[in-house]
Structure formats: structure tokens, C-alpha cells
Design a protein with these regions (language model features):
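Amphipathic cytosolic juxtamembrane alpha-helices at the membrane-cytosol interface
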Residues: 99, 112-117, 121, 182-210
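Generic hydrophobic transmembrane alpha-helix motif, especially the helices
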Residues: 125-162
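Interhelical loop and adjacent transmembrane-helix boundary motif
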Residues: 68-72, 226-265
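Cytoplasmic-entry segments and transmembrane alpha-helices of multi-pass inner-membrane transporters
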Residues: 26-27, 99-139, 167-172
Length: 265
């Protein structure tokens, strides 16, 4: 007859001092790690606010920037860059977000393991790792050389950078929707398209929106693609589809590399 060993129970009579001490040590280590992560961000925010708060004014927000290499009579403004950023980012969002969500729906609900789903997944992974400057050069070679600089070219570049982020984040959110919701809808006779539109998407909409906002935030801060696509001018261009344009990241780069702003050697 085999003897089954009983599982050993912890001796609760032993002093709990070591357990409490180890818990405190772990807690303080996590707090320290959190502080070490926050310190650089706090330093950046403090520097930006302390050095830039005195410059922010209505004139700065509504005025035009001073052309590079021109002796300034004032600090200039950022209105053309603000308008350009809104236009280009909005157009890139309109291009990338619907296409990315539709791609994620196909991957998760329709594609399964067929060749098209595998191709979409592979290309989204590859595009995620493409440097932004390479994407800018790509749009420059296939669009700008033929049609000229424009906000539309910048939107194409930013949209290509946003697309894989939207696809992957939306795909992960759709995977989190319980299969029981789908099965219950199918049991009621709903079609796959109706289940996707009325059950799956509403259940995952919060995560999809969060992923889209992350993609928008990334696109709005990109500089390299815009240097090759919009030209960066000092006047506002409300027509995002034609003519050179500007944006906040590219305008900051132009200001930083302007000779008039360089310290004497």
C-alpha cells in the first residue's frame, strides 16, 4: 500500500518579523524604482516650464515665426506650426485609424491563419520597426519628387507610421473580448458582420481608442518624416493638400538649427 505524504504546512508559530521586513524591503525597492523613472520626466517638465512659461503669450500662439537667419525684432510666434500640426495629424489620423481598425478586425475575426492575414501581420510588424526618417525618405521618393512638398505628403508619412500601431493595439483589444459574447450572438442567429459591429467592437472600443490616441501622440511628435515632406515654411497654409507647410516639430528643428540662434564659437 503506497504511503501518500501529506503536504507540509508553514509553521505559523515562527516569528513573522522576517516576512514583514522582506515585504518592507520589496515595497521600498518598488518605490525607489518608480522615483528613478519619474525623476527624468520631472526634470524635463521643470526645465521646459521654467524656461518657456515666460514666453507663452497670445502673440506667441497667434503670430508667425521669424524666418531663419534673420535678426529678430521679437520672439515670433508658432501659429503656422500649430495649424500645420493640427491639419497634418488630423489627415494622417483619418487615413490610418479606420484602415488600422479594419485590418485588426480582419486579423481577429475573419482572416484566421490564411495567407492574407499572415501577410498583414508580417507587414505590420515590419513597419513597426521602420525608422521614421526612412519612412520620410520613402514618401519623398515616391510622392514629393513628383508632386512637390505638401501637408498631404507629411500626412502620408505619419499615417504609415501610425498604421502598424493601430493594427496591433486594436488586434490585442479584440482578442480580449470573451468568445462567450460572440457565441451567444451566434446562438441568436446573428451574422458574423453583425456580431462584429454590435458586440465585438463596442466591447473593445475603449482599448481601440486608447491605441489610436497613442498612435496620434507618436505621429504628432515626429520630426524626421516632416523634414522630407512639408519643407517647413514660416507662413500658415490652410490648404493641407497643396503647397509647402509647417508643423511644430519641424519648426522647432528649424529654430534650433538657425544660425541666429547658435551661440558664438
Amino acid at each position: 500500500m503506497a504511503v501518500v505524504a501529506e503536504p507540509q504546512q508553514p509553521d505559523l508559530r515562527e516569528p513573522a518579523g522576517w516576512r514583514r521586513s522582506s515585504n518592507r524591503i520589496a515595497t521600498w525597492l518598488m518605490v525607489l524604482a518608480f522615483v528613478l523613472v519619474i525623476i527624468p520626466l520631472g526634470f524635463v517638465l521643470f526645465t521646459v516650464i521654467s524656461k518657456g512659461a515666460s514666453i507663452i503669450s497670445w502673440q506667441f500662439l497667434t503670430g508667425s515665426p521669424i524666418p531663419p537667419n534673420v535678426l529678430p525684432a521679437g520672439i515670433g510666434g508658432m501659429w503656422p506650426a500649430i495649424l500645420g500640426t493640427i491639419e497634418i495629424t488630423a489627415l494622417a489620423t483619418v487615413m490610418a485609424v479606420p484602415l488600422g481598425v479594419l485590418g485588426a478586425i480582419y486579423l481577429n475575426e475573419y482572416g484566421g491563419k490564411n495567407w492574407l492575414a499572415a501577410l498583414i501581420g508580417f507587414m505590420s510588424d515590419v513597419m513597426t520597426g521602420v525608422p521614421s526618417i526612412v519612412m520620410g525618405l520613402f514618401i519623398f521618393s515616391i510622392w514629393v519628387l513628383h508632386f512637390g512638398f505638401s501637408g498631404l505628403a507629411g500626412a502620408f508619412a505619419l499615417g504609415c507610421l501610425m498604421l502598424p500601431v493601430v493594427i496591433r493595439s486594436s488586434d490585442e483589444m479584440l482578442k480580449l473580448v470573451p468568445d462567450s459574447l460572440r457565441e451567444g450572438s451566434y446562438a441568436l442567429g446573428a451574422t458574423k458582420a453583425r456580431v462584429t459591429a454590435t458586440v465585438v467592437l463596442p466591447a473593445a472600443i475603449g482599448g481601440i481608442v486608447s491605441g489610436a490616441l497613442l498612435a496620434v501622440a507618436r505621429a504628432a511628435g515626429e520630426t524626421a518624416p516632416l523634414l522630407f515632406t512639408i519643407l517647413t515654411v514660416t507662413t500658415a497654409n490652410p490648404n493641407v493638400f497643396s503647397g509647402a507647410n509647417t508643423a511644430i516639430p519641424s519648426q522647432i528643428f528649424a529654430n534650433a538649427t538657425s544660425r541666429i540662434l547658435r551661440p558664438p564659437v
